[in-house]
């Protein structure tokens, strides 16, 4: 699945949410039988309900240019304020949601170069691995525990995010 999307538009309302839910259910059903490989490779990134679809994939491949998060930078800035999250600060945005930090924090399986051949090779490697014994989302209790114990009183930085979700 090539996942380059800002998510459902607010004007799509319940119809958009239902479509996303159908996609989620299809991924969960399919991944029992064959690896479902997600790829985020462009500058649009993957946000909203489709970022959940990305997390449901058996394997997730990103490039350095990719971004992955539940809410996009503009949405966070609108809700939290520019002092909290400046969507124009590209180094900050990529330090929090970019492909490299998502890989280093264990939320994706492969970080590859920005080219068709690199992405294709990683996709073929993921398919060759077959269905994982345990999917990332099967570890929800571990992620919930980590988030519950995280101090949210101050703005997190990339190093804290990497430490919070460090690969074990």
Q: Model-flagged regions — what are they?
A:
Residues 1:
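Glycine-rich beta-alpha loop segments
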Residues 7-134:
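Conserved catalytic cores of soluble enzyme domains
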Residues 121-168:
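Intrinsically disordered, low-complexity segments enriched in small/flexible residues
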